[in-house]
Amino acid sequence: MTLTIGIPLDAVILGALITEFGAKMVSKFKQLLLGFSGSFLLSITLIELLPNLFEQGLDRRLISLIILGGILLQMILESFSKGAEHGHAHLNESDGFSGFTLIFSALFVHAFIEGIPLDGEKHLLLAVSLHKVPIAMILYTLALRANLSKIQAFGALILFGLITPLGSLITHLDWVLTYTPYLNALSAGIFLHVGAIILFESEKGHRFNLARIVMVLLGMLLAYWIG
């Protein structure tokens, strides 16, 4: 449980530090890390999480339906988060604090749900935490654009980092245990959607980007190797 709390929190802190002290490298680094983390998250979901769900003897059609529900839920969340989960959120100056609050709230829900299947799943925990680094970079930037102080922006990131472990903690409640596989299926749908969007989005002008393809391939290979 210590890892479940510490690693996601460390990930968002790292994202803030990279944004604060490495401004010149942020854009390129963020895109490469998105490619790697999205590929790794999608691959771990396909290699580990989905097989585990379907091996539990539950109604496969129901599990499949809930996974589809997770995909739909993520689509709805992204209409509010402006695509921050895969690196495309933009905040106009006119949006201000209210615009940031809307994006943060959607990411808050996203982070809570993605924490549900993490307890005891080291590989999935690693995948989610890696994915949090570029999201934290985006969220920190948006917070500053919304005229939050650096301390307030950092505080928002700490809260964002803690909500994922909270999602994992609720699975220890007796009344939640019965529904955990179904909640995991909902999370799987979210992972599939986010990972696929990152994996299949094109460069501007559909240009060939060898570095990004290499990062995507490395994410797949790492997931296969440890899975």
Question: What are these model-derived regions, one by one?
Answer:
Residues M1-G227:
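Intrinsically disordered, metal-sensing/regulatory segments
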